[in-house]
């Protein structure tokens, strides 16, 4: 969905990403390549972890747009890894709305695929999802 912001008149591109229990609502705004997550700079929010920051910027780097758009994120739930992956999916989806030509390279890299893996539920009679009590033969 493309929305023109009333106060600045700039086009804003939206994308939502999910991973495990994390949800990220991402806005791409023409700018200088800043990452703002929940009102904090991205490197501070993700604890200066280059891996998380690389994951998030990967779709932009694939298309050569690293310093052309600011990424504004509202992330909730999960941990930092789930949030970083959900932001990546949101950025990729927003880039598809920006230009439909962006879709094939992003799809080839796997950035538009939602990771279906989630925590397996605990079963009764077991300690965890699969961990059984110690077996005693006698």
UniProtKB/Swiss-Prot annotation:
Recorded GO CC terms: cytosolic small ribosomal subunit
MF terms (GO), sorted A to Z: RNA binding; structural constituent of ribosome
Keywords: Ribonucleoprotein, Ribosomal protein
Extent of Basic residues compositional bias: 119-138
Gene name, Swiss-Prot/TrEMBL: rpsI
GO BP annotations listed: translation
Region (Disordered): 100-138
Protein name in UniProt: Small ribosomal subunit protein uS9
InterPro entries: Ribosomal_Su5_D2-typ_SF (IPR020568), Ribosomal_uS9 (IPR000754), Ribosomal_uS9_bac/plastid (IPR023035), Ribosomal_uS9_CS (IPR020574), Ribsml_uS5_D2-typ_fold_subgr (IPR014721)
Family: Belongs to the universal ribosomal protein uS9 family.
One Pfam family this sequence matches: Ribosomal_S9
Residue stretches of biased makeup (Basic and acidic residues): 100-118
């Amino acid at each position: 969905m493309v929305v023109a912001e009333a106060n600045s008149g700039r086009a804003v591109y939206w994308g939502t990403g999910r991973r495990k229990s994390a949800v990220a609502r991402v806005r791409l705004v023409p700018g200088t390549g800043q990452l703002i997550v929940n009102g904090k700079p991205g490197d501070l929010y993700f604890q200066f972890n280059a891996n998380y920051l690389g994951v998030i910027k990967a779709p932009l780097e694939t298309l050569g747009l690293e310093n052309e758009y600011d990424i504004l994120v509202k992330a909730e739930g999960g941990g930092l890894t789930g949030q970083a992956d959900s932001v990546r999916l949101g950025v990729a989806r927003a880039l598809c709305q920006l230009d439909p030509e962006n879709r094939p390279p992003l799809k080839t890299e796997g950035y538009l695929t939602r990771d279906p893996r989630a925590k397996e539920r605990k079963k009764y009679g077991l300690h965890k999802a699969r961990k059984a009590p110690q077996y005693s033969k006698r």
